[in-house]
Amino acid sequence: MAKRHKHYNARGGGKSKSKKSKPHGESRQRKNHRGGTSINRNRSELLLGGGDLMNPHQVEDYYFGSTAKKSSLRSGGFRPGRLTEADELDTGRLPSRKRPVEFIKAKELYDPSHDLILKLVKKNQHFDEPNSDGYNSSQSVSLREEEQDGEDEQQDVDTQEIPSKNTTVKIRSDNVVSENGDSESNSSANDAELFYVDMEGEEKTADNYIKTVDVDVQERSLKLNDCTEFQPTLRVGNVELNLKDGGSGSIEVDKPKSSYHPFHSYIQNVMENVQNYDSDDDFDENGNDVEQSFSISSDYEFESSEELITTGGTIEQFDSSMKSLTIEEIPGKTITASLTTKDISQGNSDNSSGDESFGFCEDDFEGSIGKVFVSNIRIGAGTHSYHVSCHEIYGDSEPRWVDDEMMNEIIAEMGLPEHRFRAYYKHLHKSFIEEEEEPEEYADIPFDDDDSDDSTADQCEPFAEDDLGEDLDDLVSYALKYNKQRKIEYHTTSLDIRGKGRNKHLIFDQTAGMDEDIKLMLQNKFATRQINKTKKRRAKEDFLSQSHASSTDLLMKYPYGLHIQNIKDEFDAFYRNDRQSITFPPLDPHGNKIIGKFAYNYFMKASNIGKGKSTKVYVEKTKKTRFNKPAYHIISQLLRKRPVFMRIDQKAPTDTQSTFNRTVRLKVSKENFNISEGQIVGEDAPEIGIDNIGRRMLEKLGWNIGQGLGAHGNQGINEPILAKVKKNKSGLRHTSENQQ
């Protein structure tokens, strides 16, 4: 019989075996055992209060549902006391995006800022009082207006009683303010029927009395421009003015009291240039020195900045005063300068004290300038830079580059007077910049006259001409004599070479007719040339190996092969450094497999790249490499296996192969292993030598050659027992003599 599938059970034929299948027809309404249909309590339109509260099944069906599963999340989905229509249940099953949106108009106007403003108005009532100046602040006026608007909008609260049998309920009702400002009633019923107004009120008792406490509040005068802060300085472009608050909104400007002149710095620079003036062009046409003196005269007296402002002085006055400054040539060697200002006279006095070299003045030791360390100076076209380190200023000993202005602030902070700045900078420049030495001029050395030179030249000329002529004749005669031999061409041939490595030698032709001495000499020269080539090649390889010893490229570092310990060292270095990948030289398949095992135990990833003899192992780090330690117990086992791995893409020389300690087979002749019948064992063994320790002990005990090893009277045999080789199976008594 064919097997029926489960979907046949839901077709109504036969008894349903599936729990999920539903019968056809009126299956949604459960039939009562009395013949009627039971009401679906989940879709009941009656409140639970109208039902039977004593029936636990009805309460359970209402809250949790009888058709729902025990573990269903839909149980308890209805609120008590709510009507559940069929439409609401249908919409409840829909997703949120498909449910209809309902808009409900609020019964009250929600305005939290309005109540907050009213509280602030009551709290700041003392601002409404007039100030000492006789006017009210704008803030108090605005707050009062807002308070009046709030009082107009606020409505009275009525306490109403709804008559019932035994209870009275007080309801606080507020009118709803529409968008146009008109009040609308919540119902169309009459006020007399809905509300009850208590006209008597409540009696005032002692408990309802609220005690009030008078608190003295300090009056605060609010200014019109209270938001503006007073700043003591005013900057306009590059000009900075000091201000004072005069009160009552007035501001005063502080004028500088110190004397100031716009050309003060210019005149001071001119005077310094005049004092330091030194020129090499002060010579006339005949080479005599021209003595000059300069005099700078000025009849203008400097005024303060206040006098300039009051008198309304202009720049033209200063231009006329500058015209009076003249430089005149006066015979004399002294340089004179006359100035009427006090500032320049003081500056000259400072310069006189500042001309002393740094370290020879008492002012140099007033501060702690020795804590400023200057390690280098960069000289520029306009400004210089200094490499300075000062723990007192920066809090550390690290040097940094600073400019001239910052350097002046540092040395001033360390206590060096201003008039010693120049000497300090000279001291720094002399310590770092070496003065160029002028080349020596030999102007004082007298030269010979022309007459003496002519006389010496006349004496040398005849001798030189005679020698030159003789040499030319000899040279011409020698060239003509051997001219024919120079054009002769000689036929050269190279000798043949036979052998490899150290066995290379020359092959001489018997028809060449060479002597034995010449042949031996050529053989020695050829051997020397081969040795020199080998030395040069080894020197080149040693140089390359030393240069690539610290290289990260293993193909250059190991040109012929590497040891098992080298592989471990490379993995250790790669594990500690910041590189992410490494490539090993191409080895044989077993060597590449060993490198893969090393990578696995170091928690790295190994992959083969290339084909054939150029197959290399590419190793890269992974996330596990950082958080795991290598398995050194397994790595130590790998070190005990195959020690040497040669590269398969390079052919190593014979001398290099010996450096890897390769095992070499010994070529032993096979004759020693052929043992014949009747051969005496140890027949060819040598006699025990004198160096043997056992023989020397016996000789000290009195033993001599030819004696036995026994005691006196029983020395034993003098010769050892001979042992013969027996290879056939004929027996011990069978010998070759018996066969005969």
Swiss-Prot record:
Protein name (database record): Protein SQS1
Compositionally biased residues, Polar residues: 133-142, 162-190
One GO process term, biological-process aspect: mRNA processing
Domain R3H: 561-623
Gene name of the record: SQS1
Ranges of compositional bias, category Basic residues: 1-22
Superkingdom of source: Eukaryota
Main location per the UniProt record: cytoplasm
Gene Ontology cellular-component annotations: cytoplasm; nucleus
Pfam families in UniProt: G-patch
